[in-house]
């Protein structure tokens, strides 16, 4: 049985004081929740303070990115050791905004994924198609390429520990959402490709949906057999709305 994961991706939002206020409110609201794994992924600048605030709670900490090298002359980058030192157990890899604005390739995603796993940090590896790709009916070929290249050459154990997030790029921050059936179709396809690559690990891997998840659609999405949680953007920035996602009912 795959435990649902609700992951809040704060993107470039929240100062230290705003972040601390948020997690204080969230911590109180989700006390006692054990059937859903809760994750917040703040900006690098507030990881330390957020970690101090959530210690001993049921909230996990993740980073939004990492670099594939252990250390060195890579100005502006951050390593797995630095992330772990702030208390992170997860890291987002290959988010569509990283691919779009910073030119991240599947090969870079693969390197980061392996670096995270080597450091015992769980990568949340993002895949997804643009609106143009969906309209051109190449969604599945795009997704297959991203999965096969971005998640190549893992051990079976690493493959089962990895989390995948399907984020249709056309549904991120637009208010548009893939219907539950559309999302399930792609999630099922991802699991099928993963099974070809890593056999039984495909049944263990959690596949999150990330595309304008909100309190109004989360229950219908989570009813689908291959949707194991959400990678949440805007709705994770307010404690009240994120709590509703965490406490969704099928």
Swiss-Prot record:
InterPro entries: Aldolase_TIM, TIM_sf, TrioseP_Isoase_bac/euk, Triosephosphate_isomerase, Triosephosphate_isomerase_AS. GO terms for molecular function: triose-phosphate isomerase activity. Pathway: Carbohydrate biosynthesis; gluconeogenesis; Carbohydrate degradation; glycolysis; D-glyceraldehyde 3-phosphate from glycerone phosphate: step 1/1. GO terms for biological process: gluconeogenesis; glyceraldehyde-3-phosphate biosynthetic process; glycerol catabolic process; glycolytic process. It is found in: Cytoplasm. It catalyses: D-glyceraldehyde 3-phosphate = dihydroxyacetone phosphate. GO terms for cellular component: cytosol. It is an enzyme of class 5 (isomerase). Substrate binds at residues 9-11, 173, 212, 233-234. Keywords: Cytoplasm, Gluconeogenesis, Glycolysis, Isomerase. The active site is at 95 (electrophile), 167 (proton acceptor). Its EC number is 5.3.1.1. Disulfide bonds: none annotated. Involved in the gluconeogenesis. Catalyzes stereospecifically the conversion of dihydroxyacetone phosphate (DHAP) to D-glyceraldehyde-3-phosphate (G3P). Belongs to the triosephosphate isomerase family. Homodimer. This is Triosephosphate isomerase. The gene is tpiA.
């Amino acid at each position: 049985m795959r435990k649902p994961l609700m992951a809040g991706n704060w993107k470039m939002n929240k100062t230290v004081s705003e972040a601390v206020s948020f997690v204080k409110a969230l911590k109180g609201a989700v006390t006692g929740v054990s059937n859903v794994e809760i994750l917040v992924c703040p900006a690098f600048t507030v990881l330390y303070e957020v970690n101090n605030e959530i210690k001993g709670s049921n909230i996990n900490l993740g980073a939004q990115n990492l670099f594939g090298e252990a250390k060195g002359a890579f100005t502006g980058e951050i390593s797995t050791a630095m992330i772990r030192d702030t208390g992170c157990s997860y890291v987002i890899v290959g988010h569509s905004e990283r691919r779009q604005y910073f030119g991240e390739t599947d090969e870079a995603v693969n390197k980061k994924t392996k670096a995270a796993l080597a450091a015992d940090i769980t990568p949340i590896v993002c895949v997804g198609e643009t609106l143009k790709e969906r309209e051109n009916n190449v969604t599945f070929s795009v997704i297959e390429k991203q999965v096969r290249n971005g998640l190549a050459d893992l051990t079976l154990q690493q493959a089962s520990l990895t989390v995948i997030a399907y984020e249709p790029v056309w549904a991120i921050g637009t208010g548009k959402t893939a219907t539950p059936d559309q999302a399930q179709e792609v999630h099922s396809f991802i699991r099928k490709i993963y099974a070809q690559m890593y056999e039984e690990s495909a049944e263990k891997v959690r596949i999150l949906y990330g595309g304008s998840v909100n309190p109004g659609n989360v229950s219908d999405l989570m009813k689908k057999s291959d949707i194991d949680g959400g990678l949440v953007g805007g709705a994770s920035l307010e404690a009240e709305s994120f709590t509703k996602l965490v406490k969704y009912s099928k």
